[in-house]
C-alpha cells in the first residue's frame, strides 16, 4: 500500500541521514509485519553475500514470531547476470546459519526447530532457483557432515558410520567399505586403532 511505501521511504531516508553503521536495520510496519534493510558494500570480496546471509539469520533470530520473509531480490542494484549468483550465496549463508543439532535435546522440539520460510520475490526467480541447486547440494553435504560429527561415539561407531555412508549410493556416489583385513593390507593401523 501507499502508506507502507511512504513509511519505508521515510525510514530509508533517515538511515541515510544518520549514516547508520549497522549492516541490517529493522522497521515495524505493523504488529505483524517488519521491514529489514540490508546495506550492501559497494566493494566486496568472495563469500560476502554468504556472510551477509548468515548475519541476517542471526539478526532475525531475536524476533521470535517471524515465520516467513519476503526477499526483494530486484532491489539490489547489481547487473542482471550477477543477481542469481549473489542471491543464491545469500540464501546459502542464511540456510547454513540455520543449522541446529537437536536430536538429543529434551527442550520443546517445535520451538528449537523453528523454521523460517525465505520467499524470493524477483523477476529472476527461476534463474535464482536454478543457480541455488548447486549451493543446496553443498548445504545438504555440510548438514550431513555436521549431523555425523555431532553424534556421540557410542552411537556413531564404525559399523553405524558405514551404514550412513552407504545411504549416499542413492545419490550416485560410489562407496567402497574397507574391512579389517583390507585396512591391515593397506597399512592403515592408526585407523584400526581408533575404530576398536
Model-flagged regions — what are they?
Residues 1-196:
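Short amphipathic alpha-helical segment within the helicase RecA-like ATPase core
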Amino acid at each position: 500500500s501507499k502508506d507502507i511505501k511512504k513509511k519505508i521511504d521515510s525510514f530509508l531516508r533517515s538511515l541515510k541521514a544518520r549514516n547508520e553503521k549497522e549492516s541490517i536495520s529493522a522497521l515495524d510496519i505493523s504488529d505483524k509485519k517488519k521491514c529489514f534493510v540490508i546495506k550492501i558494500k559497494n566493494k566486496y570480496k568472495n563469500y560476502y553475500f554468504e556472510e551477509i546471509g548468515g548475519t541476517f539469520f542471526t539478526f532475525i533470530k531475536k524476533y521470535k514470531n517471524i515465520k516467513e520473509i519476503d526477499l526483494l531480490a530486484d532491489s539490489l542494484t547489481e547487473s542482471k547476470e550477477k543477481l542469481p549468483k549473489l542471491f543464491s550465496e545469500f540464501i546459502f549463508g542464511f540456510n547454513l546459519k540455520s543449522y541446529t543439532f537437536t536430536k538429543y535435546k529434551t527442550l520443546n522440539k517445535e520451538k528449537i526447530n523453528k523454521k523460517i520460510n525465505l520467499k524470493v520475490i524477483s523477476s529472476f526467480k527461476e534463474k535464482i532457483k536454478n543457480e541455488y541447486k548447486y549451493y543446496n547440494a553443498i548445504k545438504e553435504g555440510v548438514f550431513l557432515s555436521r549431523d555425523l560429527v555431532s553424534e556421540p561415539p557410542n552411537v556413531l561407531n564404525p559399523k553405524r558410520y558405514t551404514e550412513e555412508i552407504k545411504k549416499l549410493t542413492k545419490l550416485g556416489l560410489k562407496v567402497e567399505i574397507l574391512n579389517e583385513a583390507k585396512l591391515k593390507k593397506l597399512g592403515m593401523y592408526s585407523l584400526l586403532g581408533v575404530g576398536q
